[in-house]
Amino acid sequence: MLFITGPLYSGKRTFAKPFGGRQIYEVQTLAANAESLPALADELAQYDVVTATEVGGGVVPIDPAQRAAREAAGRLACLLAARAECVVQMF
């Protein structure tokens, strides 16, 4: 699996498309509602290309639910990076 991460509008999807295969984009949105992040990471690792937007930089949200969602997204990204054959960070 190729894992591509980076900020919004950094060209992740454009970079990913030529690789073909099964692709899933913006997986950070799945993390907040996941019962088990390791199980979700295992499921997503079955794709050929996975992209996630980095949400951990910048202003920390006041809302606890938004902070928890960002934390979950970051932990999911770490799990995906550990399972990936290759990780690409876009800037």
Regions found by a protein language model. Give the residues of each.
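Glycine-rich P-loop/Walker A and Walker A-like loops and their local beta1-loop-alpha1 context
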Residues: 1-21, 25
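Conserved inter-motif catalytic segment of the P-loop NTP-binding fold
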Residues: 18, 23-47, 55
